[in-house]
Structure formats: structure tokens, C-alpha cells
Amino acid sequence: MTNITLSEVVELYSERCGNPHLTVYDVSGVNRDKEFFEPSKQVGDDTSNYQVVPPHYFACNLMHVGRDMVLPISQNHTDKNKYVSPAYTVFRIKENDFLLDDYLFMILKSKEKDRYFWFHTDSSVRDGMSWEDFSSIEIPLPGIEVQREYVAVYKAMQHNLNAMQNKLDDLKLVCDAYIEQLRQQYPPTQNRKVHHRSR
């Protein structure tokens, strides 16, 4: 297995949407769980300079690494363009036959890389990270078949975790409903005053 720097396999991408009237429902953000979310919390008065994130491309906010202690990054897994504010950095994988985009995203999502990103933030007020520092990071590069195996195992684990979380959520709903039923059947009695006889 060899190591490569991100600069060898990724490149910046810059495409402005050109639409000055995007709404919060058109614009995406990236959360700490490294997922796109809509609607965005807010948009500017003129959104024509908002950036396009095509399918399979990545968006990250390098300025929030120090604040969030994680790198807010996500990949567009849909078949439609997403739009993000100019605060985000958009990049893509260079054309190649030796790196899977799912494998790269899996590596960039890891807690180990988050610690590395946080440690290498700059000394600015926001504790951000420059593109140069980000793209100089090394990642392990196994063979393409090994990458596929890693991704398959990772996705299976994520699926199991999500299934378990859904079951826990369902169990919580059942428990909450049962507790509410008990409250209605057995309402709390009012505190009664106890009178002590004087001697």
C-alpha cells in the first residue's frame, strides 16, 4: 500500500450558479455529520455567486474546522446539482482509474482525519484551514479491489448502525406511549398534610 497526497488526485472546481434569487430551499449546507442538509439556515440577498456542486463532487467548509473540531465535508450522492454559499470549497477527483470517490469520502469522514484537520488549522480568528494545507494531506491508497472491499464493509456497517438507531427510536416511542398511558391510569396523588397531635 502506498500513500498519496490529495493534491495528486483532487482539484478545485468553481462554477457559479448565476441565479440571484435562490431561496433557503434551493441552497444546501453541510453539517457536522458530513451530510448535506436543506433548507439552508440563510441565504444572501444576491445568490448569483453561489457555487454549484455537481453529482459526485465534494463541498467542504475549511473555515469551520477549528470551530467545529471536524471538517464539514460532504459528497453529492444525488443525480442533481446542489448549491452552496461562497464560504464553501468545492472540489472533484481528477480523472483516474485507481481511486474510488466513495473510498476517498470514507477516508475524509474518519475521526482520525478530523483530528489531523483540527491540529493543522491556522492561527486566524476562525481557526480555518487553507486549501494548500488540505491538499497536502496524505491518504493511504490500496489497490482498487481493496478499496471496493473497504467501501462495501463500511456501507454495510453504516446500514446496520442506521437500522439499530431506527429500532431504538421505535422503542423510545413505545416506551413514551406506555409511560403516558400509566400517567393517565394512575395520576399522581396530591400531597396530604399530616397533622401531628400535640402532647
Which residue ranges define each predicted feature?
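DNA target-recognition patches
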Residues: S7-D46, V84
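A short beta-sheet element
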Residues: P55, A59-K109
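Non-catalytic DNA-recognition/assembly elements of restriction-modification systems
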Residues: M1-C17, S136, P140-R199
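Periplasmic-binding protein-like
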Residues: K113-F117
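A short glycine-rich beta-alpha junction/loop motif
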Residues: N81-A87, D122-R148
